[in-house]
C-alpha cells in the first residue's frame, strides 16, 4: 500500500472513531435522562400511593405523569447528527410514537414504517476503527425497554408505562 492510501484510511478511521465517540457520548446523556425520568415517574407513583391527595391534586399528578411519559418518548427519540440514536439500524425514523388519547391517557408505541413493520430493531451500527477491527456503537430502544424480571421473563417497560398512564388517569378521575 502506498502512503496516500495509508493516510486516506487513517483519516477514515479517525473520523469513524470521532463519530462513534460522539454518538456514545450523546447516548450516555440520553440514557442518564431516561434513568432520571423513570426515577421521577417512580416518585410520582409513590406520591399517589400515600393516599393523602385531593382529587384536584391527583389530576395534577396525572398531568405531571403524562408530561414525564412524553419527555421519556422525546428522550428515546434523541438524535446525533440528525440520526436517531435508539432505532437500531433504522436511524432515519423516530423509534417511538406518542399517542395522546381523548380520555387523557398517553400511550407510547414502537413506531412503524409505511408497510406496518416496527421501525426500531436490534441491529447494531458498526464502524471500522482500524484495519480488520470494527465496533458496535449503539443500543436500540428495544434493548432499553425489554428487561428481564427476577424470574428471567421479559418485561416490556413500554407496556408498563402505558398501564401507568391508564391507572393514573383512572385514579385522577375517581375510577379507582
Where on the chain are the PLM-derived regions?
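Amphipathic alpha-helical polymerization modules
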Residues: 1-92, 169-176
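Bacterial flagellar/type III secretion structural subunits and associated motility module proteins
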Residues: 2-21, 28, 90-176
Amino acid at each position: 500500500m502506498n502512503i496516500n492510501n495509508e493516510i486516506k484510511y487513517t483519516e477514515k478511521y479517525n473520523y469513524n472513531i470521532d463519530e462513534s465517540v460522539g454518538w456514545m457520548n450523546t447516548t450516555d446523556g440520553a440514557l442518564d435522562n431516561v434513568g432520571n425520568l423513570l426515577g421521577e415517574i417512580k416518585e410520582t407513583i409513590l406520591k399517589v400511593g400515600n393516599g393523602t391527595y385531593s382529587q384536584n391534586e391527583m389530576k395534577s399528578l396525572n398531568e405531571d405523569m403524562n408530561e414525564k411519559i412524553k419527555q421519556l418518548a422525546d428522550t428515546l427519540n434523541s438524535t446525533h447528527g440528525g440520526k436517531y440514536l435508539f432505532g437500531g439500524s433504522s436511524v432515519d425514523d423516530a423509534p417511538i410514537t406518542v399517542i395522546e388519547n381523548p380520555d387523557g391517557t398517553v400511550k407510547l408505541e414502537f413506531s412503524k414504517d409505511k408497510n406496518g413493520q416496527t421501525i426500531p430493531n436490534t441491529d447494531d451500527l458498526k464502524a471500522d476503527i482500524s484495519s480488520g477491527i470494527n465496533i458496535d456503537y449503539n443500543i436500540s430502544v428495544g434493548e432499553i425497554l425489554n428487561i428481564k424480571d427476577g424470574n428471567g421473563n421479559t418485561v416490556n417497560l413500554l407496556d408498563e408505562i402505558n398501564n401507568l398512564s391508564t391507572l393514573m388517569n383512572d385514579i385522577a378521575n375517581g375510577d379507582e
